[in-house]
Regions:
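Acyl-donor-binding surface of acyltransferase catalytic domains
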Residues: 1-60, 161, 167, 183-187
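Conserved active-site tyrosine of GNAT-family acetyltransferases
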Residues: 18, 171, 176
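Short acidic/polar active-site loop segments enriched in Thr and Asp
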Residues: 24, 157, 177
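A structural microfeature
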Residues: 27, 108-110, 180
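Ligand-binding pocket scaffold of soluble enzyme catalytic domains
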Residues: 60, 64-65, 102, 119-122, ...
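Helix-loop element at the rim of GNAT/NAT acetyltransferase active sites that forms part
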Residues: 67-80
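A conserved beta-strand-loop-helix scaffold within acyl/acetyltransferase catalytic domains
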Residues: 77-133
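Conserved acetyl-CoA-binding loop-helix of GNAT-fold acetyltransferases
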Residues: 130, 136-149, 153, 163, ...
Length: 191
């Protein structure tokens, strides 16, 4: 996988080279940034509902994470990513934190993770994923809230998100502003 930002130098030449080497463009995203304090101030009225969020701290916890991804993106190489995440948890990597939101019956319905090393000014929020039946019920916002709170506790002053078109309006309401465009390039290699 390769990420190409709109502000990268030689953007057009890089894009041409990636396409010539068999990489395919995925859907475009937007890099959005906000001050942690701005997001936290906008959240109290936005987060409500029956879901309970918790940090995922064990390899077994990430099975729930994969269930969410498999439901939302069937056929995607979810196991490859989740196995990498399991390895990072097993190695006690302090730079990545995983969260999930659970319905009252215990079903994992939303998830997200955060890259942040304590002391860094920016935390990158990634993987915001919600099962279809739980959309428009503040599940995505709940995942934003728990990660923003964790980033604040770890000393981050700003949050960054590589936002899909679906996420951008939610993020804008919480104070995020677009900074650049982003395109993912992926080369499919046969197993």
């Amino acid at each position: 996988m390769w990420k190409l930002y709109g502000h990268d130098r030689a953007h057009d030449a890089l894009r041409t080279a990636l396409l010539a080497r068999g990489f395919e463009e995925n859907d475009p995203s937007t890099l959005m940034v906000a001050a942690v304090d701005t997001v936290l101030a906008a959240l109290p009225a936005a987060v409500s509902g029956p879901l309970a969020a918790r940090q995922l701290t064990t390899v077994r916890d990430l099975d729930a994470y994969q269930q969410i991804w498999d439901d939302v993106w069937p056929g995607a190489p979810n196991a490859r990513y989740v196995n990498d995440y399991k390895s990072r948890i097993d190695q006690h990597d302090p730079g990545i934190l995983f969260y999930a939101g659970f319905a009252p019956d215990g079903e994992a319905v939303t998830s997200g993770y955060m890259f942040h090393h304590p002391g860094d000014p920016i935390a990158l929020l990634c993987g915001g994923t919600t099962k279809a039946a739980w959309r428009r019920q503040h599940a995505y916002t709940l995942m934003l809230a728990v990660r923003a709170q964790a980033a604040a506790k770890r000393g981050a002053s700003h949050l960054a998100v590589e936002a899909s078109p679906e996420s951008q309006p939610i993020l804008a309401r919480l104070g995020f502003e677009p900074l650049s465009t982003l395109m993912f390039y992926e080369k499919h290699i046969a197993d």
